[in-house]
């Protein structure tokens, strides 16, 4: 029960993030392609929460949602150990999605993680803790962290932390990386892909390659929009057991060409409707016109200001932040605050399936001055801006969320 409540909170957080970024005049905006991983951010905040206490911990929990601290810790642990655990290996040919989910902690060699924190992040979140020397070997430490992210995302996210992301006063960095590559349960025939018009938010249009199919599809019609579910192949049994997870992409297509902002506002204000609309997509319906664009997009941001604007302030403030459960007591430990939250996502959708990757890094510093029912035949022509989600359907967690406003652009 507590897991289901935490999943509802994670879905609501996904929509808050996407809605906020879509409205932002800088670093995104309603006329830009967007892709974020709410699950990656959730995992990084769980690592941060494990080292927080007092009002700082309370604010992190409140940001994650009303299910509460134990529920969100349980969700983060379940995702790391079960739902997105990397259980592939040599000779593993089950055919399901390839999934990697990794947590990491890098602490300056002059400091020491508290034993309780190290134990929790290792046992509950499968986080690898590594000492690095930010003070004496800064560039080597940054390179080591970036190589970890590149490896964990199968090379899709490179040079993640910029040169100015860490300095000699950096005490620690917390990280999450995830990678997903899955084939569609029912692949598109590339011979049926053809260029057509995609209508842009500014009233213009571009030519884009559209995938099409005459097969029945999982589509539901709601007030003002339609939802398409494209399941990924689950694969068979491996090593004597089932994969225990099921992934799908959901495309939310507004009825009106310029209806994406209104649809986003509606779904952000009622995330329960989002959950219900996806849960109801269990029956296929015959389709008339059916077109979905191929697209590749990437998005990178320092999410610190977004998190502040959404109510998570204390971890960034000195005095105020209490992250004293992370490292052993010292004058430096009492001054640790979050200086930046770097986040990057990559999503590619084509006839075969989807490849996606995400990285989140919480960088610390030492504090000083603060910073409706379906019809019998349904048309689904995604020739104008739409929203998408990639979810793990058995838990319901939102792994990726984004909007496509121009499939011919990668940003």
Curated annotation (Swiss-Prot):
Keyword Transmembrane: no
Matching PROSITE patterns: SERPIN
Stretches for region RCL: 353-377
Function: Probable serine protease inhibitor.
Annotated protein name in UniProt: Serpin-Z1
Domain notes for this protein: The reactive center loop (RCL) extends out from the body of the protein and directs binding to the target protease. The protease cleaves the serpin at the reactive site within the RCL, establishing a covalent linkage between the carboxyl group of the serpin reactive site and the serine hydroxyl of the protease. The resulting inactive serpin-protease complex is highly stable.
Keywords: Protease inhibitor, Serine protease inhibitor
Record family assignment: Belongs to the serpin family.
Pfam families: Serpin
Coiled coil region boundaries: none
CDD domains assigned: serpinP_plants
Species of origin: Oryza sativa subsp. japonica (Rice)
GO MF term set: serine-type endopeptidase inhibitor activity
Site, Reactive bond: residue positions: 367-368
Entry keyword Repressor: no
GO cellular component: extracellular space
